Amino acid sequence: KKDGYPVEADNCAFVCFGYDNAYCDKLCGDKKADSGYCYWVHILCYCYGLPDNEPTKTNGKC
């Protein structure tokens, strides 16, 4: 398992407007992660415990 910013089909991370932790936690759960939250510095969803084969970004939106 790994931690990171999950990406959409265009290789951009998921934006979480309004700092919506519930949105990110659900999104991460749908991707089989343990949990997730909205990282306020970048306004992007960050997941903990993603499967190793799930694409992620290490930094930046795209």
From Swiss-Prot:
Provide the taxonomic classification: Eukaryota, Metazoa, Ecdysozoa, Arthropoda, Chelicerata
What are this entry's molecular-function GO terms? sodium channel inhibitor activity; toxin activity
The family classification in the record reads:
Belongs to the long (4 C-C) scorpion toxin superfamily. Sodium channel inhibitor family. Alpha subfamily.
Q: Which SMART domains is this protein grouped with?
A: Knot1
* LCN-type CS-alpha/beta domain: residues covered: 2-62
> Which residues are annotated with the PTM Cysteine amide?
C62
Keyword Coiled coil applies: no
Spell out the InterPro entries in the cross-references. Answer: LCN-type_CS_alpha_beta_dom, Scorpion_toxin-like, Scorpion_toxin-like_sf, Scorpion_toxinL, Scorpion_toxinL/defensin
The record, for PROSITE patterns, names:
LCN_CSAB (PS51863)
Where does this protein have coiled-coil stretches?
none
Keyword terms, alphabetized: Amidation, Disulfide bond, Ion channel impairing toxin, Neurotoxin, Secreted, Toxin, Voltage-gated sodium channel impairing toxin
Q: Where in the cell is it found?
A: Secreted
Disulfide pattern? C12-C62, C16-C38, C24-C45, C28-C47
What does the comment on domains in this protein's record state? Has the structural arrangement of an alpha-helix connected to antiparallel beta-sheets by disulfide bonds (CS-alpha/beta).
What function does the entry list?
A: Alpha toxins bind voltage-independently at site-3 of sodium channels (Nav) and inhibit the inactivation of the activated channels, thereby blocking neuronal transmission. Is lethal to mice.
List cellular component terms (GO).
extracellular region
- Identify the main location: secreted
Q: Which protein, by its recorded name, is this?
A: Toxin Tb3
Q: One GO biological process from the UniProt record?
A: defense response
Tissue specificity here reads: Expressed by the venom gland.
